[in-house]
From Swiss-Prot:
Mn(2+) 2 binds at D155, H157, D241, D243. It is an enzyme of class 3 (hydrolase). Mn(2+) 1 binds at H130, D155, D159, D241. GO terms for molecular function: agmatinase activity; formimidoylglutamase activity; manganese ion binding. Its EC number is 3.5.3.8. SUPFAM superfamilies: Arginase/deacetylase (SSF52768). Pathway: Amino-acid degradation; L-histidine degradation into L-glutamate; L-glutamate from N-formimidoyl-L-glutamate (hydrolase route): step 1/1. This is Formimidoylglutamase. One of its GO terms (biological process) is L-histidine catabolic process to glutamate and formamide. The lineage of its organism: Bacteria, Pseudomonadati, Pseudomonadota, Gammaproteobacteria, Enterobacterales. Catalyzes the conversion of N-formimidoyl-L-glutamate to L-glutamate and formamide.
Length: 313
């Protein structure tokens, strides 16, 4: 059974510069850490949650270790300077998934996300493998049942695989099937896709599903496509698979990208999403601390989370 645990206070440590000025603060000094999972107490805040699960990665024949991602990313975030927006972060702990009950863990995450959103929070989830996206996305769909929800994925992979059980490669097929079951439109855009890492069958599935696809080669000039997608939906769920980044920026994932989309381009793509007023949920997935020897990759991933919270409107 998936268990909830509060985040350890030892994760939120850093350099104390407060002697210099009242606003010389870092995230470890402004993040609120909750000892209970009680989103109803934190309206208008951002729920920072971990999904400590890599069962989907294992099922997808990937490199396990992403279950350690949430706490590694917290440690990297802790010492970053606190600016406007970061005071809204409330750490609502980790959902720790037992092996091999991925489906049960996804349902628990789905319910937790829906509860947060219905309480007036927004959700920033730290994975975990990309199996995180089905639980997170389903919770968003549940919370906004009467509105159109757009799913924006920055990823080298389409993750529309067809298998007999859930994996880290199936979340968007699962979300498409959920939309079908609910008789609602499936609005999905994937930026940073590597043609070399996706079979023709996956491209055919994306075309059949009317997915907006932007290849890694074209992300430098994709702001118009991003704006067009934002305009056509009411609410947005943003998910960033860190393997969208090039291997030299992000080696600490299950499947590092030989080409990838540089961090600066990823940031420019997500800025209008964060500032749109439509973003309700975001996550960072696939970070694997086992392959981050000096913590540099954690800082790259944390910068994305830092920027999302800062820009979020």
């Amino acid at each position: 059974m998936t268990q909830w645990y509060p985040a350890s206070p030892a994760l939120w440590q850093g350099r104390d510069d407060s002697i210099e000025a009242p606003d010389a603060r870092r995230l470890f000094q402004t993040v609120t850490r909750s000892e209970t999972f009680s989103p109803e107490n934190w309206q208008q805040k951002i729920a920072l949650m971990g999904f400590a699960c890599d069962e989907g990665v294992k099922r997808n024949a990937g490199r396990p270790g992403a279950a350690g991602g949430p706490d590694a990313l917290r440690k990297a975030l802790a010492n970053m300077a606190s600016h406007q927006g970061h005071e809204r972060l409330v750490d609502l702990g980790n959902w720790v998934a037992p092996t091999p009950d991925l489906e049960g863990a996804q349902q628990v995450l789905r319910d937790a996300v829906s509860r947060c959103l219905r309480a007036g929070m927004r959700t920033l989830v730290l994975g975990g493998g990309h199996e995180t996206a089905f639980g997170h996305g389903a919770g968003v769909l549940d919370a906004f049942a009467q509105e159109s929800v757009g799913i924006i994925n920055l990823d080298a992979h389409l993750d529309l695989r067809q298998t007999d059980r859930a994996t880290s490669g199936t979340p968007f097929r699962q979300l498409a099937q959920l939309c079908d079951a609910q008789s609602r439109a499936f609005h999905y855009a994937c930026f940073g896709v590597s043609r070399a890492a996706n079979t023709q069958a996956l491209w055919r599935e994306a075309q059949w599903r009317n997915v907006t696809v932007v290849e890694d080669l074209d992300c430098h000039d994709a702001l118009a496509q991003m704006a067009q997608f934002i305009d056509k939906v009411d609410k947005i769920y943003l998910t960033i698979d860190l393997d969208v980044l090039p291997v030299w920026e992000m080696p600490a994932v299950s499947a590092p990208a030989a080409l990838g989309v540089p961090l600066i381009q990823v940031l420019r793509l997500i800025e209008p999403v964060c500032r749109s007023g439509k973003l309700q949920a975001a996550d960072l997935v696939e970070f694997n601390p086992r392959f981050d020897e000096d913590g540099a990759a954690a800082r790259v991933a944390a910068r994305l989370g830092w920027q999302i919270a800062h820009w979020w409107r």
